[in-house]
């Protein structure tokens, strides 16, 4: 991070110029401008590398991020030219001409949609662009095949429909060019280069001043800096803005945990069976078969020693070498017919196997820190043959976040309405004390019509659950009758409670069961959420994972019920994590409570009622924040 000589007045002048010129439709409040000014001051004068900002719903986090990025870009461009901002006529400098500067990272589709709308609304296409996951982009040649009803059987269509019955096109996931890049891609698919929706979006985002990416996409492109094909599009930028940043530690750790299954071995084994029918086996294919048996053994039993993981990674790399030799032998005999039939398939498998080089490197380094190793084996009960899935985690999570995320950031702005103790958050990120500073924005919402009721309906801890759950579910049903003409959410905390409530409702003839929307998968949840938003029926969305990424303003949600305090389920991994980060368990629960309450009351004059049923809420709710505590009322539901 480069430090510049700059005055407070220069920052103020640059900020004023940006706000005046960026878009006439952006009209920030004085409070918002003061926030941006203070962030800039902490970066350029106080020389902090990271700013942690707790800003509640409705405080304009997106606009704060946009104005900060463009002002930062403007200041740096002028300072790189050696200019004193107080001594020049800023009207002669076009702030929209400056180069690549920042990333704006989001956690979910709701935020991406909001930013997409802001880009259109504020006419920011020349300085800001969004790139989504590849499944959101159409592959034109694959879609042509998908829509070819004369092709029987249409295997591509069958694959896509099986995964998504409502699919209208073939996404980039199913692209024909999957194993091609560079000059080979141009020769094989010349017509795709300039019209591919995904590649066009990627190209635009790669040279735009502010690129909007989701966390997973950004983390994946940052993890392969040695790949020139990736680096030419995305590299470390001056600014990285993280929205909903409270999710960042879990997102990073979940992405970089190693989960090993035998899926790739099954694919290879199936292809070998096909090859045998067409070409018969040769000596090399028999060697591959024998080596496969060795690899499969890794999944027949739980892991007892971490060295088994390293050995398996080595075995997979050896498998790749054997497959390469096998293909050479088949190609020499079949005069390229083998390559034509199976080349693309094996190229894909080789890419998967190549990942084991990184796995082996990471696992070898982790083995040097035995105190940080955690592994578990989950029995797969979906098959007649007993086999296991193996999960390996690094217990030093702050180190994982630091290495794979923080070290890829030049200057970082972390924003969320749910940061709680910001020093704890900084510790989870692996930040040093002298690297970061903290800021807090109070809510400007009017909560006078939005009480949060502590109903003290019974304890749902382990010892009291069975004796109280039926009574609490009855209370839940009675509350829904009080809001029979209003939409709402019921947070069940677990699928067990979810199913118990579902059964309770189905057996109650006084209830219109069709009003309650239950889901089993993320896709179902998103579909039901869309139905709920678009319908006038007073639906109630019910589930254990409705804390994040849901925007239900006004009549879309007038009440919420939280049945149980959302503590994480205690297992061996959670116990280990609690030993390492004693504050994490309670912090994780508080985050979920605050996020859940925030699904309604989406703007200053919005209102809703919140019902907390589990008596354990009384023990933790006072550790949330002042806005929530100020809304609390005790109310027995009889």
Regions found by a protein language model. Name each.
Residues 186-206, 222-230, 331-454, 518-525, ...:
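A contiguous, basic/glycine-rich beta-loop/short-helix subdomain that forms a polymer-engagement track
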Residues 2-16, 74-211, 216-219, 283-287, ...:
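A substrate-engagement module of RecA-like helicase motors
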Residues 492-521:
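Conserved helicase motor "Helicase C" RecA-like lobe of SF1/SF2 P-loop NTPases
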Residues 456-493:
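Conserved interdomain hinge at the start of the Helicase C-terminal
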Residues 71, 113, 117, 191-331, ...:
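Signature of the SF2 helicase/ATPase Hel1-core->accessory helical subdomain module
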Residues 456-466, 523-620:
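Conserved RecA-like P-loop NTPase helicase motor core
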Residues 47-68:
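Walker A/P-loop
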Residues 2-54:
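Conserved pre-motif I regulatory segment
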């Amino acid at each position: 991070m480069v430090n510049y000589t700059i005055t407070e007045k220069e920052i103020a002048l640059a900020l004023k110029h940006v706000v005046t010129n960026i878009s006439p439709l952006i009209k920030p409040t004085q409070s918002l401008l003061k926030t941006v000014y203070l962030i800039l001051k902490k970066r350029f004068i106080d020389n902090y590398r990271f700013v942690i900002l707790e800003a509640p719903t409705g405080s304009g986090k997106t606009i704060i991020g946009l104005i900060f990025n463009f002002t930062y870009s403007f200041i740096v461009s002028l300072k790189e030219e050696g200019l004193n901002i107080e001594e020049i006529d800023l009207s002669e400098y076009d702030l929209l001409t400056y180069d690549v500067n920042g990333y704006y990272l989001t956690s979910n589709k709701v935020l991406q949609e909001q930013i997409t709308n802001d880009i259109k609304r504020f006419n920011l296409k020349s300085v800001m662009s969004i790139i989504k996951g590849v499944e959101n982009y159409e592959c034109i040649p694959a879609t042509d095949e998908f829509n070819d009803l004369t092709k029987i059987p249409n295997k591509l269509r069958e694959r896509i429909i099986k995964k998504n019955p409502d699919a209208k096109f073939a996404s980039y996931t199913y692209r024909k060019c999957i194993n091609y890049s560079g000059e080979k891609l141009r020769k094989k698919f010349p017509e795709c280069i300039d019209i591919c929706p995904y590649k066009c979006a990627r190209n635009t985002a790669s040279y735009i001043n502010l690129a909007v990416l989701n966390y997973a996409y950004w983390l994946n492109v940052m993890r392969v800096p040695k790949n020139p094909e990736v680096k030419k599009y995305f590299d470390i930028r001056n600014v990285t803005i993280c929205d909903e940043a409270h999710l960042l530690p879990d997102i990073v750790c979940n992405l970089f945990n190693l989960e090993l299954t035998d899926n790739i071995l099954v694919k290879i084994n199936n292809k070998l069976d096909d090859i045998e029918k067409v070409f018969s086996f040769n000596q090399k294919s028999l060697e591959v078969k024998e080596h496969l048996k060795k690899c499969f053994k890794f999944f027949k039993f739980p892991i007892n020693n971490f060295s088994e993981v390293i050995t398996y990674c080595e075995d997979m790399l050896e498998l790749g070498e054997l497959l390469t030799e096998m293909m050479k032998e088949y190609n020499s005999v079949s005069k390229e017919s083998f390559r034509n039939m199976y080349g693309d398939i094996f190229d894909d498998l080789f890419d998967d196997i190549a990942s084991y080089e990184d796995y082996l490197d990471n696992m070898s380094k982790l083995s040097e820190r035995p105190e940080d190793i955690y592994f578990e084996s989950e029995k797969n009960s979906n098959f007649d043959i007993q086999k296991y899935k193996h999960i390996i985690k690094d217990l030093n999570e702050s180190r994982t976040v630091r290495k794979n995320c923080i070290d890829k950031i030049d200057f970082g702005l972390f924003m969320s309405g749910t940061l709680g103790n910001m020093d704890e958050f900084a510790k989870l990120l692996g930040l040093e004390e002298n690297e970061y500073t903290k800021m807090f924005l109070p809510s400007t919402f009017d909560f006078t019509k939005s009480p949060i009721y502590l109903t003290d309906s019974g304890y749902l801890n382990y010892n009291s659950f069975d004796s109280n759950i039926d009574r609490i579910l009855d209370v839940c049903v009675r509350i829904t009758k009080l809001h029979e003409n209003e939409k709402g959410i019921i947070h069940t905390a677990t699928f067990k409670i979810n199913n118990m409530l579902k059964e309770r409702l189905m057996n109650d003839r006084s209830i219109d069961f069709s009003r309650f929307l239950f889901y089993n998968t993320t896709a179902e949840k998103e579909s039901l959420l869309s139905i709920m938003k678009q319908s006038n029926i007073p639906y109630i969305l019910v589930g254990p994972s409705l804390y994040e990424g849901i925007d239900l303003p006004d009549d879309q949600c007038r009440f919420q019920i939280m049945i149980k305090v959302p503590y994480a389920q205690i297992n061996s991994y959670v116990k280990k994590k609690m030993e390492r980060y004693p504050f994490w368990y309670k912090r994780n629960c508080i985050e979920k409570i605050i996020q859940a309450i925030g699904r309604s009351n989406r703007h200053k004059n919005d209102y809703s009622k919140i019902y907390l049923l589990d008596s354990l809420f009384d023990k933790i709710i006072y550790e949330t924040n002042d806005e929530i505590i100020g809304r609390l009322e005790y109310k027995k539901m009889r």
